[in-house]
């Protein structure tokens, strides 16, 4: 899982090499896939150059795509800048309306949200998007249910908490909530649910922390990296690993 990564260069190349070294089944992003402004002219160099073999259908310049899609992004604020995210929507083939959607891999059900204020279906807890999520979480039979978005509901980073997105995820049945936007790594615990901020995916600008929230358990900003998430029916393991291989954080959610 990578976030705030979409800047072609050495930093992203190092993160991509780390992710490839794991031999992951698929890749999930927490947004800002294509800096600086989500343009069609930069999207393949910022994404396909590093991850084309996970994308289906892939029609870019950097090699062969996958036989099935194994790349699942979320929209970040930078992705919206050009033509209301149309280059992103054209580049990827995703489920549902493509702005927010869900998919299942093994025992894990992913719910990928559109957290920017430009989202036509809204981002507040009474929005159409929130109603979709509440219903979809309730209907899911998966062992684990992960909610992924760009803007963090809670963060001790530069942008801070995004109050509009503080939906009752725990009450609705989410196992964990993952976001980006702040170029840091943080793990917080709210209502016994882990919230992760994962924004060190390759943007050269790393943010500082502000006053830590009371719910903040782990904070890190020294180097780029990615999250490795592994799951079976018994447990989910979340790790944040730097490009040098240091495991900064490891958190386990175990079944009852």
What residue spans do the PLM features occupy?
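A short C-terminal boundary segment appended to hydrolase-like catalytic domains
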Residues: 218-256
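Active-site glycine-centered loops adjacent to acidic/histidine catalytic or metal-binding residues
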Residues: 4, 31-32, 76-77, 150, ...
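Extended active-site neighborhood of metal-dependent phosphoesterases/phosphodiesterases
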Residues: 40-144, 162-176, 182-232
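N-terminal active-site segment of His-dependent metallophosphoesterases
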Residues: 1-46, 135, 155-156
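Short acidic, glycine-rich surface-loop motifs adjacent to enzyme active sites
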Residues: 140-156
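Active-site His/acidic residue clusters
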Residues: 156-162
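Short, well-ordered beta-to-alpha junction loops that form the rim of enzyme active sites
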Residues: 115, 149-152, 181, 241
């Amino acid at each position: 899982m990578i976030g705030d990564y979409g800047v072609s260069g050495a930093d992203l190349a190092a993160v991509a090499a780390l992710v490839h070294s794991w031999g992951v089944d698929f890749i999930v992003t927490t947004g800002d896939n294509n800096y600086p402004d989500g343009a069609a002219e930069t999207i393949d160099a910022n994404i396909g150059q590093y991850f084309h073999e996970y994308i289906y259908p892939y029609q870019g310049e950097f090699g062969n795509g996958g036989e099935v899609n194994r790349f699942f992004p979320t929209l970040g604020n930078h992705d919206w800048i050009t033509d209301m995210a149309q280059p992103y929507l054209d580049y990827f083939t995703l489920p549902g309306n493509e702005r927010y959607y869900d998919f299942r891999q093994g025992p894990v059900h992913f719910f990928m949200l559109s957290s920017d204020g430009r989202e036509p279906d809204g981002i507040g807890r009474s929005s159409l998007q929130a109603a979709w999520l509440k219903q979809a979480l309730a209907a899911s039979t998966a062992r684990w249910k992960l909610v992924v978005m760009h803007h963090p509901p809670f963060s001790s980073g530069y942008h801070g908490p995004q109050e509009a997105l503080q939906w009752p995820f725990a009450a609705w049945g989410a196992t964990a909530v993952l976001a980006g936007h702040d170029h840091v790594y943080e793990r917080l615990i709210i209502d016994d649910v882990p919230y992760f901020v994962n924004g060190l995916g390759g943007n050269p600008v790393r943010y500082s922390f502000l006053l830590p929230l009371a719910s903040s358990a782990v904070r890190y900003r020294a180097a780029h990296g990615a999250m490795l998430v592994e799951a079976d029916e018994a447990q989910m393991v979340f790790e944040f690993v730097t490009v040098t291989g240091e495991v900064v954080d490891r958190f386990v959610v175990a079944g009852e």
